[in-house]
Amino acid sequence: MGSYEDKYIQWTMLRQQRDQDVHELTNLFHTLCIKLGIKYSEKHLVLKYRSCLHRYIQEEMEFLDISSLGTTYRYAAKIEQKFKQKKQDFGSANQK
């Protein structure tokens, strides 16, 4: 990572990439938070983190009232795992 400005731009544009899992995104999120000295409230960090996730994860979490970043991460990881399992089950069903 380059200068402070580069890191800040990366923070503002942070989104989960196509082949990036929740764990990788979370590590990058925390790394940027620390390096930039982000001092948002927990609620604002939760909102920022949720906005970075894939749309299907955001939609699954839409009606959950989560105020903890750790809880948000655990839900996102579970939703991602459930989605991957469904995708895998669908793929194996089509091969029969």
Language model region names:
Residues 2-96:
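Positively charged, low-complexity alpha-helical assembly interface
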